[in-house]
Amino acid sequence: MGHFTFTGLCLLAMFLSLRGAECYTCPIDWLPKNGLCYKVFSNPNTWLDAELFCRKFKPGCRLASLHRDADSADLAEYISDYLKVDGSVWIGLNDPQKKRTWVWSDRSSSNYFSWNQGEPNNSKNKEYCVHLWAPTGYLKWNDAPCESLHPFLCQCKY
């Protein structure tokens, strides 16, 4: 009886530890944050190509959605540490209807915005996508033409 109980407890412990590891293990060089994993990719892409790259990377991946100052600060530090090129970084915020109604590509909702001063300004009536602006240390947002080429930040559910 004692051997059976010991074996059962060992199997239960192994199952629980494997299950926990599977639910929230980010790959190496990804940043774990609030149940998601984030990675900055240095290869410049348009906003749409960056979004499609994230989606193809793994089911449940999109361009990153930012919902709090604390998360933005951690992600800005991560980008500064890992980005291999200079430049602003696409995030998942865009205006697909071109009516100044900003939505996240993962369809999440938020009242949080971190626009740089004077933004969004829709310069030349063609800025419908959003990047983390490099001159602000990746803390503030700027609207930009979606066809511009920038590195990008993916978020994935693991």
Swiss-Prot record:
InterPro entries named among the record's database cross-references? C-type_lectin-like (IPR001304), C-type_lectin-like/link_sf (IPR016186), C-type_lectin/snaclec_domain (IPR050111), C-type_lectin_CS (IPR018378), CTDL_fold (IPR016187)
Q: Does the record carry Transmembrane as a key word? A: no
Question: Which GO cellular component terms, listed alphabetically, does the Swiss-Prot or TrEMBL entry include?
Answer: extracellular region
Q: Where is the signal peptide, in residue numbers?
A: 1-23
**What residue stretches are annotated with the C-type lectin domain?**
33-155
Show the disulfide pairing: C26-C37, C54-C154, C61-C156, C129-C146
A single GO molecular function, which one?
Answer: metal ion binding
Quaternary structure and partners: Dimer. Probably non-covalently linked.
User: Hey, what tissues is this thing expressed in?
Assistant: Expressed by the venom gland.
Matching PANTHER family: MANNOSE, PHOSPHOLIPASE, LECTIN RECEPTOR RELATED (PTHR22803)
Function, as annotated, reads:
Recombinant C-type lectin BML-2 is able to agglutinate erythrocytes. May be a calcium-dependent lectin.
Task: List where the motif Mannose-binding lies.
Answer: 119-121
Q: What is this protein called?
A: C-type lectin BML-2
**Residues annotated to bind Ca(2+):** E127, N142, D143
Q: Any idea which UniProt keywords this protein has?
A: Calcium, Disulfide bond, Glycoprotein, Hemagglutinin, Lectin, Metal-binding, Secreted, Signal
